[in-house]
Amino acid sequence: PRSTPFGTRRQRQMCIRDRMRSTPQVIGAARDAVAYARSQVEIELNGVGDNPIFFPDDDGGTYLTGANFQGTPMAFGLEMLGTAITTVSVLSERRLNRLLNRNLSCGLPAFLTKGAGMFSGMMLAQYTAGALCCEARILSAPAATGSIPAAADQEDFVSMGMTTALKAKQILKNAQAVLAIEMMAGAQAMDFRRPLKAGKGTEAAYEVIRKHVAFLEEDRPLHADINRLAAVVESGEILEAVEKAIGKLD
């Protein structure tokens, strides 16, 4: 079959899978989940969580006993947030797999290394991404349904909101590392495609990535690169550069 810099026609056809073309739809759904979680947290921060609630007036005031302490709205929002971020992480790892697997990468070298058979390239980085996704999947199991009665059954239902918050925090940290690994692989793949150029936004992201992580010429420990780029993902530097190049993504 006729070959091109992007592989044979059959290889190019194999590159088009749901995980590639579905990315905008999945990211859109995840953004909706983030917006909902944020709205619940902001409502809680601006609300009253006391019990009872006191209303002072000239006659001495009144008080109402209720359950404003109940954190279920936030717990549900954070559960949704954890699920959304985990899904984004899994999708990222699957795209990473297509960059590293020479049977799926449309002509890129195996594991994005010049020395296939002698160097591992980014193979072991995928192990890290896979492990982080597996942990996120476990953490995205709901905690809000795990209420245990306490205080002689007076407090017989609680939101488990703090547990959902701690889970979501770890899931987010994992996702930042997974995305960092995918971006490292993406930059490596772009170097192998030179002198071809990508779109303005992609090239802007590439410049930021290469400012922090060098091309993987030979095998080296990648943990420092991953941690450094994960911090860049968290900072929003890549998003800022992309939006400067192509406009707001909202």
Where are these regions (language model features)?
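Catalytic-core signal marking the mid-to-C-terminal active-site face
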Residues: 111, 147-158, 173, 181-250
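Long, structured protein-protein interaction/assembly regions in large complexes
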Residues: 48-75
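Short, charged/polar, low-complexity loop and linker segments
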Residues: 17, 57-64, 152-160
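Single conserved hydrophobic/aromatic residue that forms the stacking wall/gate
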Residues: 1-12, 16
